[in-house]
Amino acid sequence: MADFMETEDKRSVIKEKLRQQFDGKIVRKDLTKKIKEGANVPVYVLEFLLGQYCSSDDPEVVEDGVNNVKRILADNFVRPDEAQKILSILRQRGSYTVIDKITVNLNIKRDYYEAEFSNLGLKDIPIDEEYPAKFDRLLCGGIWCIVQLDYEYMEEDRNGTPIRIRKLTPIQMPHVDIAELKQGRKAFTQDEWMDVLLRSIGMEPDTLSYREKWLLIIRMLPLVENNFNLCELGPRSTGKSHLYKEISPNSILVSGGQTTVANLFYNMGRKTVGLVGLWDCVAFDEVAGIKFKDKDGVQIMKDYMASGSFARGKEEKAASASMVFVGNINQSVDVLLKTSSLFLSLIHISEPTRHAQIS
């Protein structure tokens, strides 16, 4: 009983400090699960909305906020298979509000910015320059937004688009204020801050040992350190890849299968940098199934992991993305250590020549 009261007091202290230091940016994780079902948007988007509408201890306010978030998603979220239906409604009504991932590019020939809608399938939509100036993440991979669209077809402007962006509002953190984060961190002890970090990724620290807490925090290192390479092997369905797919908008999870040097590092035809130049962290799920179509793919990956750079053609390129390899093991660690090797399934990646001889 005493331990329970101590735990509750500790939670109350942390919650109060969070409200004082990060008001409007904290959210109950159990609410995310209620809304996630049926909404195909990343967890960090749901949490941003919940932080806006449910930042209260009053059950009635929280319930109203959850209903508001559900209504917003139901009314405005664009599913790719309903894109034409949404465009038809936009044409009929003259205006419509959508939730979609927006990427902005600068059209150098015409000297203005253009927006691209991921699910709606729209490209080359003019957008006011105030938005990329204010939310620079629009230019670097895109962000999820609520967008108010107008539709006005003009006969004399047949070459233009009838669709215009009236207002754009990000529904994920468009940027991180490091100074604010550092200032707020000063109010917490090390143990309290560890608990905050773990709860931020959906883990309950009160059920974990001190060692388990540190192991889970190690998972986060590739998200904040440049060129930090990590391999995690464990039983199936234990949440190893969840962190890299759902928690951060700056990481990408590549499902196991074939990949190419052009996709991962550099496309010599288009002169564009691949995933390592676009994301803070590139994670590979089911790493045992990864295969490169290019013969030199594994060697280029090794060079990049060792030095943070790679050579393609006549140029050497540098990037800062960390790499994470997530894989499954089908036996207990104790049994594997006695009878085999934890990394046996990765031989074809690390030593392709030797693997061919073994086969």
Show where each model-derived region lies.
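A generic structural micro-environment signature
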Residues: 123, 155, 203, 207, ...
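Residue-level detector of conserved catalytic or cofactor/ligand-binding positions
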Residues: 345-358
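Short amphipathic alpha-helical surface micro-motifs
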Residues: 125-132, 149-153, 176-181, 235-236, ...
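Conserved ASCE/P-loop NTPase catalytic core
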Residues: 204-336, 342
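Short acidic (Asp/Glu) and glycine-rich catalytic loops that position anionic groups and cofactors
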Residues: 173-176, 279-284, 350
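Extended, charged/polar low-complexity intrinsically disordered regions
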Residues: 2-200
